[in-house]
Amino acid sequence: MTKTPDFTHATYKLVRCIGCDATVSVCRPQEGEYAQCPRCHHKLQSGSRWSLKRCSLIALSILILMPFALGYPLLSLDLLGTKIDASVWKGIWKMAVEGYSYTAFMIFICAVLMPVSFAILVIMLQISKLLKIKPRNVLLFVGYIKPWVMFDVYLVALAVTMFKVREYATLEVDVYLIAFIFTALLTTLLFIKINLDDLWHDFYPEQKPVTASDKPLELCTACDYTFLKEDQKYDHRHRAICPRCASLIETPDSIKLQRVWATLVAGIIMLFPANLLPISGVYLTGNLSQDTLMSGVMSFISMGSYFVAFVVFFASIFVPVSKILIMLYLLASVHFKWQHSIKWQMRLLHIVHFVGRWSMLDLFVLALMMSLVTRGQIINFTVGPAAFYFGAAVFLTMISTSQFDSRLIWKVYDRKQ
């Protein structure tokens, strides 16, 4: 039997929804409950959280496992009696020293820098709590880097690599793969359980919650804080800033759209060479065989690995192209004031945010493939010129979607009502 929550003695406050800009009266949810916007169904507050102490212990466990997950062999290739190891760091380093430093740096950001930084920042939050420090910048950085933590994507890349190299030699799994799997699972768990809204509330409790007011309200999108317009502060250039996180508040819609268009168009330009040029090459007994994104999918199909072919096609071709098409449609809806189904438009935007990061799968596979075989042996993997353009396209489209403000769609919807 479902227990009905008791809101008799609850304290309500007004918040502006970051999804549709509606003003909603909400109370602090209890454990297992959450408050959502009645218009766009965006989650406004959640009572499901783990304590910061528990999250910091998970983060500490991640840092302890990181050297084993990143620096030690995960896979081994037995090629004519010679054992060749593949690790995360070895793949990135080999890619960098062989002239693909920009591509290696993009992989380093997503596979090493961001996961390590994420765990360190969570520990810094716990230290700040013990020392009674206000960690404004730490909280902001945690929110910024969460979409770029891609350990789960790298885990899938390992599985794809296993299928890809088994046609060339015998593949063995090393014991350190267990450390990598646990690190990926713990990172994903920490990603889900850490609640930034509650952390902001814990470190910066509201002195005067907005309960009822005819005065205009402001919303800071950086820390999701609703406050009275008269309480906003100003920086040295007399620009309005949030009284809690000191981020800029007022950004004109035209500037927001320019940022989205600039990064999206740049991503589209990068996607053409990414699909037309070879992304990888294999030297086998002196003969070079190069693959584009699509021919790589076809090679998996010819091997009979239909599921792997589907995964690679979905992550490397379908997701980037569909993400661009969806963003073009949403931008056109804002510019030309198209009033289509608002629920459908918001669902498309949520899908774009969710699947965008999985496009890095192909680059992670390339890094692992390069670390398995070194130059001068019978078989050798190389990175093609398309790898950089593909990585740049993924980065630019992810930035584009993060810059798109869903409230612009709702403004068009509200004008038509």
Predicted segments with their positions:
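Long C-terminal interaction/binding lobes of large macromolecular proteins
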Residues: 1-417
